[in-house]
Amino acid sequence: MKRGKEKSSEGPLVSIVCTNYNKGTWIRDAIEGFLQQETDFPYEILIIDDSSSDNSPDIIKEFAENYPDKIRAFYNTKNLGITKTWIKVCKEANGKYIARCDGDDYWVDNEKLKKQVALLESSQGSLWCSTDFDIILPDGTKTHTSALENGIMVRATSYENLLATKGFTMASTWVVATNLMLEVNDAIDTGAIDDTFNIQLELFYRTKLTYLPEATTVYRVGHESDSHPADTIKAKQRNDRLLETQLEYIDKYRDKVDFVELSKQSMTASTNLEAMLLDERSNLLQANITIRQQQELLDELDSRIKEIQDSKRYKLAGAMAYPMAYLKRVKGRFR
């Protein structure tokens, strides 16, 4: 197991690493969150754009020019994909630790780095720290707070647990020892469909995860991204590739895998999924009952409307046939 770089009296303790591809709508939020960090140690910000076709490069350039002592920007001349781009920019890090945040997410705790670094510096067996997070939609609407603590997302806790559940540690909350991150980057498949899944497995294999149960970060969902394909075919392809990765990693570190624990985790995940499907089935049945009841009410209302319309037609026909008698009857109502 490798330790991170020794702390330099001159260089940064932490390298914030941000990857971006067509996140022009949100990248400004991410960068401002980096700049607002309150620490008692120096840190640097590395931002790499993967040949975006939107205004992302212009925004990144603006910040880099305004904060030349803090921000270093990199621009791919052709699109490499998230995994290769991540590996490439990590090699530029000068800090003892790497803090990841993707361009569509952002930090909301100004002491995020300070808290996580303190945990890692005092730890004897952990080189990796993550936190809880909130969830928002592309338009900024918050859908969930403290997603892990409130059980909205499954929190990954170990190698076996992650293999069985495809759980979450939320990459944009990570702080990892740089040397360990570089070692892991050398071990992952550069063609991975989701680099964070492979990275998490490699990290869990090598170190313990320190978890801070505070929502320091906002995770943006509901838009097209590598981890959330909008197209159903792409989504299925992603799930198939993730299954391939799960099977690959069962064999890759077979000598270290606790298969009893893996079986327990798999059975638990399967049971939880069945419970969720039963709930969904119950909700669908109830929805069908409600729809049927509403349709019956609509049919009854439609029938009443027709009766009223027929009655009005009858009265109108009578008025036209016997106008004087009809007028006398109406006039008599107002005496």
Where does each model-flagged region fall?
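Short, acidic, metal-binding catalytic loop of nucleotide-sugar glycosyltransferases
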Residues: 32-42
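Glycine-rich, basic loop-to-helix element that forms the pyrophosphate-binding segment
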Residues: 76-93, 115
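Conserved nucleotide-sugar donor-binding catalytic segment
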Residues: 131, 150-242
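Short aromatic/hydrophobic "clamp" motif used to bind/position activated sugar donors
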Residues: 98
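Conserved donor NDP-sugar-binding/catalytic core segment of glycosyltransferases
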Residues: 111-144
